[in-house]
Regions:
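N-terminal presequence-like segments and the immediate start of the first folded domain
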Residues: 1-55, 59-72, 78-128
Length: 128
């Protein structure tokens, strides 16, 4: 049976969607957006918004008992793929070793107004 994660430390969806779901050691996130928790809006500054997205990823992983090193795939959905450099900064911080980076795919997407990036991650939870 699927176990859902609803984090009070990560932005929530307006639809009845958890932040992530776990089944048989596999964690899959829902779309992670860079909304401010206190105001439920997107920062105008794309760098701030991107930092929030990756910080929420870390929160969700931590609440599941995982780390960035357990991530096996990351999908990035950009309103404008020219913003990839903003994500690369956080990518390199989380996965500095090229030999131990997850698979990654960037997509152009129709995102909510004001949203520059949404990510979806897949991770294998540690045994034990």
């Amino acid at each position: 049976m699927v176990s859902a994660i609803y984090s009070i430390k990560a932005a929530q969806h307006h639809n009845p969607v958890p932040n992530a779901a776990i089944l048989r050691g596999l964690l899959v996130t829902s779309g992670i957006l860079g909304k401010r928790l206190e105001s439920d809006d997107y920062p105008v500054d794309k760098g701030e918004q991107t930092a929030l997205v990756f910080s929420y990823l870390e929160v969700i992983l931590d609440e599941a008992g995982a780390t960035p090193q357990d991530v096996i795939k990351l999908d990035l959905y950009f309103a404008d793929k020219a913003d990839r450099a903003l994500a690369n900064e956080h990518w390199l911080r989380l996965w500095p070793d090229p030999a131990h980076r997850p698979a990654r795919q960037a997509h152009q997407a129709a995102l909510p107004d004001g949203c520059c990036l949404q990510i979806v991650a897949m991770a294998v939870l540690p045994q034990g």
